Structures are given as structure tokens and as C-alpha cells.
Amino acid sequence: MQILNGKETALTIREELKVEIDGLKEKHGRAPGLAVILVGEDPASQVYVRNKEIACEKAGIVSTAHRIDASVSQEELEALIQKLNADDTIDGILLQLPLPKGLDSQRCLELIDPGKDVDGFHPMNVGKLMLGLPGFRSCTPAGIITLLERYNLPTSGKKAVVVGRSNIVGKPLAMMLMQYGDFANATVTVCHSRTDNLAEEVKAADFVFAAIGIPKFIKKEMVKDGAVVVDVGINRTDEGLVGDCDYAALEDVASAMTPVPGGVGPMTIAQLLINTVQAYKEHVGA
């Protein structure tokens, strides 16, 4: 079985971007700028933000974290977003989710300038994905497509099953797989908690994308021989971090698979860097 190593791939992408950013900085007088908004003290969010800061620093992107107390009002948070929208040194704005109770995350996401929406969550960018128009794509599904490209695993003409229908992963990934291109053009089925005969649907897939949030949900008997399995899940259990797939059991049947950790997670951050550089280039006219 081939291991789809997201950690190594993300490192390669970061090094490539560093070279590109160095050249752009020399030509345009500044580096790309990313603003990250973190509200409250959710431990997982703090780890994610720190990892993003480290990746930005190593790639040459100027990352500014706005750490805000959970008691912030909706109006104050919206004012910060508007301020960042107007800041010409900021190319990307990332609102770390989830927000504490009492804050309207959808309202905040809709306030972000679509040209700075490097997370790809603004309705305008979601709509552009639906229409097949250029725009920012959600980082996790876009990172998955990038990983498949790097390992030359085209989905064109293949049956792909996405297990999970979240707005962050499942829905946008399904839409990306239905676009035109070698690493799209798939026949896509989306499964979820109400799907009848879910195991049968997964068994028919050439590509399985598991994003359901249940530890080791995808079993060996659910996957056909030679399938490519992409595990989006990150679940904390007594045995440590595990994915949505039973990795050890699937090694006997999958032709290629992402590990957890070290698979999709690093690619999400790599795609954030790619999107931020894209936003920067559009802003400076590169």
C-alpha cells in the first residue's frame, strides 16, 4: 500500500512557496500578509492557530494573530474584520472556528472581503465553486485534491464516495470532484448518517473520502481491493489520534491511503499558504 504522506508533501509545497515569495517580495516590496482571528481559549483552536503561524513564518508569509477574549461582542468582532478588510498589507483573513456561543459565525464569515477569504467560506466563493468559476476553495478539500495531484492519482472517470456532508469538507469536496479536469471528473456519491446501505455505497468506490467524525468507522469489509482511501478524520481516543478509517485493517485492501496524523491535516495548512499567496498576487497585480 502506498502511503499518501501529507506531511512531506506539505513541506515540499512550503519550500516551493518560500522561493516564490522571496522573488515576489523583492519585486513588490512586501511579503504576503495573513491575519488570523482567534476568539476565546479553545485548546484545539490554539494548536491549529500556532501550527498555521509556524507554517507562515517558514514560508515567508507575515502572519498576525488577533487573540481576543471570549467576552468580545459581535459588534467588536465585526469592527475588527472591517478594519482588516481595509488594511492593504493584509491579503488573507482567517476566522478560526468554532466561535464561542453568542457570536454569529456565519455573519462574520460573510463580512470578510471575498478577495481575502483564504479559507473559502464566503458565500461568494462557495457559489463560484458551484459554478466552476475561479475563486478561493476551502482549504481541506482543496488540499486533498492537491495531494492526489502530487501523487498522480487522477479521479477522472472514477467512482468517488464522500462520507460526510459538512460545509467545510464534505460538500465542497464533492463539488470539486465534479469539476472538469484529471483530478476531478469523478462520478460522486455523498453518504451520511441517513444513507441506506452505506457500506455497499463505499464498497463500490474507487476513491473513498472519509469525513464523518467517527473513529475507525470505515472497516476493511467496506472497501474494495485497490481503492484509494483519504481519511479526513482526526479523533482523540484513549489510544491517541485516530482517523475515521481502521488504518491497520485497510492496509491489506487499499492501494493508497493517508495516515492520521500526517495525512490531510498538513495539506490543509499547505493549501492555506497557497491561497494566501494567490490573494497576495491578485492584490499586487503579480
UniProtKB/Swiss-Prot annotation:
Gene Ontology, cellular component aspect: cytosol
Gene Ontology BP, a term: tetrahydrofolate interconversion
Catalysed reactions, semicolon-separated: (6R)-5,10-methylene-5,6,7,8-tetrahydrofolate + NADP(+) = (6R)-5,10-methenyltetrahydrofolate + NADPH; (6R)-5,10-methenyltetrahydrofolate + H2O = (6R)-10-formyltetrahydrofolate + H(+)
Entry GO MF terms: methenyltetrahydrofolate cyclohydrolase activity; methylenetetrahydrofolate dehydrogenase (NADP+) activity
Pfam families: THF_DHG_CYH, THF_DHG_CYH_C
This enzyme's EC code(s): 1.5.1.5, 3.5.4.9
CDD domains given in the database record: NAD_bind_m-THF_DH_Cyclohyd (cd01080)
Biological or metabolic pathway of the protein: One-carbon metabolism; tetrahydrofolate interconversion
Keywords: Amino-acid biosynthesis, Histidine biosynthesis, Hydrolase, Methionine biosynthesis, Multifunctional enzyme, NADP, One-carbon metabolism, Oxidoreductase, Purine biosynthesis
InterPro entries: Aminoacid_DH-like_N_sf, NAD(P)-bd_dom_sf, THF_DH/CycHdrlase, THF_DH/CycHdrlase_cat_dom, THF_DH/CycHdrlase_CS, THF_DH/CycHdrlase_NAD-bd_dom
Binding site for NADP(+): 164-166, 193, 234
Similarity comment: Belongs to the tetrahydrofolate dehydrogenase/cyclohydrolase family.
NCBIfam families, per database record: PRK10792.1 (NF008058), PRK14184.1 (NF010781), PRK14186.1 (NF010783)
Function: Catalyzes the oxidation of 5,10-methylenetetrahydrofolate to 5,10-methenyltetrahydrofolate and then the hydrolysis of 5,10-methenyltetrahydrofolate to 10-formyltetrahydrofolate.
Description of how the protein assembles with itself and partners: Homodimer.
Name this polypeptide is given: Bifunctional protein FolD
Organism: Maridesulfovibrio salexigens (strain ATCC 14822 / DSM 2638 / NCIMB 8403 / VKM B-1763)
Taxonomy of the source species: Bacteria, Pseudomonadati, Thermodesulfobacteriota, Desulfovibrionia, Desulfovibrionales
